[in-house]
Amino acid sequence: MTARLELGLETRAAPSAEAEARERRTILVPGVRIALLALANVIGLLAFLWPFVLPSVASHVAENHQGDGPWIVAALGAILLALLFLELGRGGLGPKTVALLGVLGAAMVALRLPGFVAGFSALFIVVLVAGNSLGPGFGFLLGCVGMFASGIFVGGLGPWLPFEMVAVGWVGAGAGLLPRGGSWRARIAWLAAFGFVSGYLYGLVMELWFWPFLTDGSALAWDPGGGAWMNVRHYLGFYVVDGLTWDTFRAVGNVVLVLAIGRPVLAALDRAARRMQLRVV
């Protein structure tokens, strides 16, 4: 009888220990995820900015990030893999999140295959609606993964790839920070407005990946010895000449797609998130 009681007590104690371990993982995993996402954003920001901070070093390396581009991709790839393994290791919600990420990433690849019409590509609608529905963390991760995968399929591998990954990831994160409450009309209006603005901001940021290496002394080039305000004027002039018209196609295209299919796609993602019990992060 004593043995049975002891066995019963041990059997009842086991679930308690398992529950405590599960609770510890529940507390730990979100913190690790946030730290990894923050690290990826910091790496992306430094990748864009370091030539401005260390112009003497930039002048001696291969132009247009041909020397450091692969290292940036490797660093971002390692962080993305860590995030995916973290989600898969959670159990329950994790694999569902990764599966949805894979489906939406494949959609981005399919929409990029036809190429760009001027600066517009329909892949941005996926990042915009997914980020808005599933949150800034998911939006950033999808932007990075989708651009990397699509770069492989369309032959877009080059020193520009890590900058595309980060820039599209920022578009998805920004969409996730928009208000989601209120009426559908307000939500779509916010998303359309952000799609328009992000169409220009994406191009404005992407031009920075190679502009610091244009040091030919022209009025549109980077001048390491010039002041900050002078270089801002140079860059804005360069952007107007090189990218403004191109990016207008993207901005207008984003608005058209959001207004045309934004609501049904958002509703489908919201419904999938509820059924799969995905948390907006």
PLM ranges: what are they?
Residues 8-23, 28-129:
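Hydrophobic transmembrane alpha-helices
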Residues 104-110, 133, 173, 196-205:
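Small-residue-rich segments of transmembrane alpha-helices in multi-pass membrane proteins
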Residues 81-91, 133-135, 174-182, 263-270:
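Structural signal for the C-terminal ends of transmembrane alpha-helices
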Residues 20-71, 157, 162, 180-281:
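Membrane-embedded alpha-helical hairpins and interfacial helices in multi-pass inner-membrane proteins
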Residues 109-124, 144-179, 189:
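Interfacial aromatic-anchored transmembrane helix boundaries in multi-pass membrane proteins
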Residues 74-83, 169-176, 251-264:
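Hydrophobic cores of alpha-helical transmembrane segments in multi-pass inner/ER membrane proteins
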